Each structure stands twice: as structure tokens, then as C-alpha cells.
Amino acid sequence: MQIILLEKIGGLGNLGDIVTVKNGYARNFLIPAGKAKRATEANMKEFEARRAELEAKQAEILADARVRQEKLDGQTITVAQKAGVDGRLFGSVTNADIAAAIVAAGIEAVKANVRLPNGPLKAVGEYEVEVALHTDAVAKITVAVVAATE
């Protein structure tokens, strides 16, 4: 199915690009989420009429993400979790736990933004973690996992 992208989508294209994707991806995700429209003549004309407005909106979203990236870059976020004597955690630290710690620090983030390439953190220590606030704004933070005191 051919669609018009209404925002930049990593691995797919930029605002206004006409791309071909699988029908299910378009119907079940991109179109309902407002990220794309079918590439019909009427939709293309409507898009061209609204192009400046959509570009301004995307620029505003990117500027907001860059501000949050500036606040986050280089920060150390501490997460306390119960641990054994050998430093292994009872449970693990997930992206939801890290996102909650970032929000507690006063910066807006959701768990989908936190990228843990090696899966949940299962031991005490410091870990480099990426927080993808936008496709063009990725902050690198240090997550310090410490043993919780009871």
C-alpha cells in the first residue's frame, strides 16, 4: 500500500515522503496513529495544502525533544533494587523502572523511549543507556543500579 508520511519515521522516511509498506502495517499502525495517510489524489492535495503546518508542528516537536535531550545527556539516574551479596538483583531493572526514575528527576519520558539493547539490567553497577526522545534526538544517560537498603 502506498502512503504519505505525516511525520518522520525511522527506517521508513521523512515528512511528505510517499512510501510503499505492507497493508497490515499501514492499516493497523501508521494510519490509526495519525503518522500516515493513504496516497490518494485527494489526500495528496490535502497534504500539500497542510504541508507548512505539519512541518512547523514537527519542528516544534523536535525542538521540545532537543531541550529534553540537553537536560538528560550525561545525567546519572540511580535506581535502587533489592540485591544479593554477590551483586545480582532479585528481579531486574526494566525500561519502565528507568523511565519512572527519569520522570522522578523531573524530565518527561515514557518506557518506550528507553532502549536496553541487552535486555533488563540484572546486576548492581553502572550502565550506559540510550533514551530516544525523537528519531533525531537520542540522549545517553548512565543508570546506576544500587542495592536497596531495607
From Swiss-Prot:
Record-level GO cellular component terms: ribonucleoprotein complex; ribosome
Family recorded in the similarity comment: Belongs to the bacterial ribosomal protein bL9 family.
Keywords, alphabetical: Ribonucleoprotein, Ribosomal protein, RNA-binding, rRNA-binding
Lineage per the UniProt record: Bacteria, Pseudomonadati, Pseudomonadota, Betaproteobacteria, Neisseriales
Keyword RNA-binding part of the UniProt annotation: yes
A Pfam family annotated for this UniProt entry: Ribosomal_L9_N
Organism of this sequence: Neisseria meningitidis serogroup A / serotype 4A (strain DSM 15465 / Z2491)
Protein name stated in the entry: Large ribosomal subunit protein bL9
SUPFAM superfamilies per UniProt: L9 N-domain-like (SSF55658), Ribosomal protein L9 C-domain (SSF55653)
Domain of life: Bacteria
